[in-house]
């Protein structure tokens, strides 16, 4: 398996244009959160025999995907695992907060997901390069690490090299 730095370097090749970088800084977080929100509404818990009814809403495609996503990040590095855990925690806090506020989270997530992907494809058109995930779907999980690295640089934080 490629190292975290190899993934980031490869991802960075098709993310050089300043417009595309801004697009990614805005849209990657939106897509990440919206994707997990959409997956939240794929119920699984109600089909699990013996699962307490109170737990059923929390057993869904998003929570079942959680160990897979964190496992991948953990294979890359501790830093990737911590960044991934932070992004997932923010995602789940927004999802649960939206549900608690009786917002139409599913519809908001669907609209954000479609709009953000449209803007992403525009960014790649400006870049003149196809999205990295067109060659390897794992790059859908590298985008958040790339964006976090860019955010850290904007904030003036030294970015350690991935191991």
Report each predicted region and the residues it spans:
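Juxtamembrane "helix exit" motif at the C-terminal ends of alpha-helical transmembrane segments
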Residues: 32-51, 88-100
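Membrane interfacial helix-start motif at the N-side
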Residues: 8-29, 35, 69-80, 126-128, ...
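Structural signature of hydrophobic alpha-helical transmembrane segments
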Residues: 49-63, 106-111
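Hydrophobic alpha-helical membrane segments of integral membrane proteins
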Residues: 82-87, 104-111
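Hydrophobic, membrane-inserted alpha-helices
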Residues: 64-72, 86-95
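Juxtamembrane/interfacial segments flanking transmembrane helices
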Residues: 43-48, 78-82, 121-137
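Membrane-proximal soluble regions of multi-pass membrane proteins
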Residues: 1-10, 125-163
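Transmembrane alpha-helical segments that form the membrane-embedded catalytic/substrate-channel core
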Residues: 66-79, 112-129, 144-151
């Amino acid at each position: 398996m490629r190292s975290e730095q190899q993934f980031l370097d490869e991802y960075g090749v098709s993310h050089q244009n300043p417009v595309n970088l801004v697009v990614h800084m805005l849209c990657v977080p939106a897509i990440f959160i919206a994707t997990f929100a959409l997956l939240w509404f794929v119920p699984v818990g109600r089909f699990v025999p013996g699962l307490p009814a109170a737990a059923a809403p929390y057993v869904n495609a998003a929570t079942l995907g959680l160990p897979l996503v964190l496992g991948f990040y953990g294979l890359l590095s501790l830093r990737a695992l911590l960044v991934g855990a932070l992004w997932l925690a923010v995602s789940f806090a927004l999802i649960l907060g939206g549900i608690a506020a009786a917002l139409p989270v599913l519809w908001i997530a669907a609209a954000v997901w479609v709009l953000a992907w449209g803007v992403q494809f525009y960014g790649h058109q400006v870049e003149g390069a196809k999205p990295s995930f067109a060659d390897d779907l794992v790059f859908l999980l590298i985008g958040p690490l790339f964006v976090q690295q860019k955010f850290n640089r904007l904030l003036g934080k030294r970015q350690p090299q991935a191991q």
